[in-house]
């Protein structure tokens, strides 16, 4: 890959009403005629099986595709209230600068200003290029594949916006500084997702280099948790590829089995999750949304889950179950081929790229970033890690009209 060698950098200030903010598409949708409130979170309800992602707060179910946009906002509000913490308002001002391989983003809100950076690697050939944001700046989708497909790589050290402070759960980083204590109940996964959204703003400000309509996000392990949150909470992300994300990422909380990281451990290890999650630690079945519902926030866009069945701590069987349940959402929206899960790999090394993943990742890139014909994304689990969805739910996907 190459770096930008222009003699002068680009500096643009984005007035966010002109640059589509995160979730903008959903915000333009009117509430259904039945009067459902699209900003209302689902209430806690104890249940051992996976919650119905089509169930509204009033007890009715989504009946049409046009109602899904409102339901997505309900699920989003529920995920904020019970899992991640509040995302907060969109910033008043974003400035983005690219100088060589350095991206600098400056964000202003309420008289305060913060700055963070990322590293850009461009593929050979003329732009504008699709872009893959790598949360954490390590691992992620194979470099050789990105180069071959003409995709730029943006390495993002997400701890700049949300620091990992261990068991103290102290909130530090640009996201928390910008909001001056108002978001201290929010977890760092949401802060990382916010940082990815600001990089999408930066991409939108440099359309001669990068394509704002062809942005992907990836990351492995804890960064995979952040990649999923980024894709779930920003509809401008065309393709999300969480890798070996473990508890707090793809796997369903209710289904984490023996050897997998328990919810209380994930909550206490780092301030990844919002403080609202603590209310469910004694009874995880009281969560009104599980991670299949978070995956559903990505629908009908591209989502490819890459998993590792050789490390019990990652909870691959619960990840496969979560993907199967989420696939019902894509199916109801008529977009089955846009969701994939691949966990059938021979190598158990954590965060190593596997040859088995190259073909589905290539198809995902071609399908969702390049607009090319490509195979539907697979749903493939390793023997011994495959889930049977039937006993894990008491709902069926509706036939949305």
Regions found by a protein language model. Name each.
Residues 8-19:
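Bacterial N-terminal signal peptides
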Residues 198-259, 268, 273:
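Primarily recognizes the serine-hydrolase "nucleophile elbow" in alpha/beta-hydrolase
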Residues 191, 195-199, 217-220, 242, ...:
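Extended catalytic-interface subdomain
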Residues 242-294, 315-323, 329-336:
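Mobile cap/lid helix-loop segments that gate and shape the active-site cleft of serine hydrolases
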Residues 26-117, 122-127, 148, 235, ...:
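Alpha/beta-hydrolase-fold serine-hydrolase catalytic core, especially in secreted/extracellular enzymes
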Residues 18-27:
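Bacterial Sec-dependent signal peptides at the C-terminal "C-region" and cleavage site
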């Amino acid at each position: 890959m190459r770096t930008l060698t222009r003699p002068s950098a680009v500096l643009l200030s984005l007035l966010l009403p002109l640059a589509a903010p995160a979730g903008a598409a959903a915000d333009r949708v009117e509430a259904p005629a039945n009067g459902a409130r699209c900003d209302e979170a689902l209430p806690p309800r104890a249940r051992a099986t996976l919650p119905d992602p089509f169930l509204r707060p009033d007890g009715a179910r989504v009946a049409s595709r046009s109602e899904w946009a409102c339901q997505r906002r309900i699920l989003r509000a529920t995920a904020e209230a019970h899992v991640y913490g509040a995302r907060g308002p969109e910033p008043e001002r974003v400035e983005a600068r690219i100088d060589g391989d350095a991206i600098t983003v400056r964000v202003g809100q309420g008289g305060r200003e913060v700055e963070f950076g990322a590293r850009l690697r461009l593929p050979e050939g003329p732009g504008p290029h699709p872009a893959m944001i790598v949360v954490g700046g390590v691992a992620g989708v194979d470099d050789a594949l990105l180069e071959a497909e003409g995709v730029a790589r943006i390495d993002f050290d997400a701890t700049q916006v949300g620091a990992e402070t261990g068991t103290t759960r102290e909130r530090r980083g640009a996201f928390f500084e910008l909001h001056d204590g108002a978001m201290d109940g929010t977890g760092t996964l949401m802060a990382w997702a916010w940082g990815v959204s600001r990089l999408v703003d930066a991409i939108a400000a440099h359309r001669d280099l990068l394509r704002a309509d062809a942005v992907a996000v990836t990351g492995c392990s804890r960064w995979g948790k952040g990649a999923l949150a980024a894709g779930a909470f920003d509809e401008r992300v065309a393709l999300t590829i969480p890798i070996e994300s473990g508890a707090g990422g793809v796997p369903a909380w209710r289904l984490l089995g023996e050897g997998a990281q328990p919810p209380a451990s994930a909550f206490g290890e780092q301030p990844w999750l919002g403080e609202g999650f603590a209310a469910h630690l004694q009874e995880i079945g009281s969560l009104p949304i599980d991670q299949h519902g978070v995956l559903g926030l990505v629908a009908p866009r591209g989502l490819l889950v890459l998993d590792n069945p050789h490390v019990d701590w990652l909870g691959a069987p619960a990840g496969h179950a979560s993907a199967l349940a989420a696939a019902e959402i894509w199916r109801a929206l008529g977009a089955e081929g846009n969701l994939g899960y691949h966990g059938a790999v021979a190598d158990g090394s954590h965060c190593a790229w596997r040859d088995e993943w190259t073909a589905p990742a290539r198809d995902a890139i071609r399908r969702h970033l390049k607009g090319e014909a490509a195979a539907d994304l697979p749903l493939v689990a390793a023997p011994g890690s495959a889930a049977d969805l039937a006993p894990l739910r008491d709902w069926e996907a509706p036939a949305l009209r």
